[in-house]
């Protein structure tokens, strides 16, 4: 299924960028009897609006109909990535430095395959994270990250 998401990313990228938005991620999953194509977008200037989602959805739907990279029927969903935004690119770890994240690695890093901690940026291809449970700083090779996303830091919510 990775090839479908790669092809959709290639089609979606110029559509999303033409509206001043950023493409965060593309997922193609089976949910029950349905296949769902999810496209996550972000507005670097602020919030993603319903108009943003509708415009990207309409333009991408037209492009997908034209190119037809997916043979079976599917549901197209376009939305913001939400509060647990995926961290997919090295630059995401620079942008979200100081934020709480969950990181799962392919192989253990200092004995851990699952790490929750504060992103401290990166050093070249290594992501620096201050582990939440013991305040130990780890350097994780970007190539070893299987999955990563932001988390809500309930300990630092004020109100």
From Swiss-Prot:
Database matches in HAMAP family: RimP (MF_01077)
GN (gene name): rimP
CDD domains associated with the record: YlxS_C
Function according to Swiss-Prot or TrEMBL: Required for maturation of 30S ribosomal subunits.
Subcellular location(s) of the protein: Cytoplasm
Database matches in InterPro entries: Ribosome_maturation_RimP (IPR003728), RimP_C (IPR028998), RimP_C_sf (IPR036847), RimP_N (IPR028989), RimP_N_sf (IPR035956)
Gene3D superfamilies: Ribosome maturation factor RimP, C-terminal domain, RimP-like superfamily, N-terminal
PANTHER family: RIBOSOME MATURATION FACTOR RIMP
Entry keyword set: Cytoplasm, Ribosome biogenesis
Example GO biological process: translation
Family membership noted in the UniProt record: Belongs to the RimP family.
Superkingdom of this protein's organism: Bacteria
GO CC annotations, alphabetized: cytosol
Protein's recorded name: Ribosome maturation factor RimP
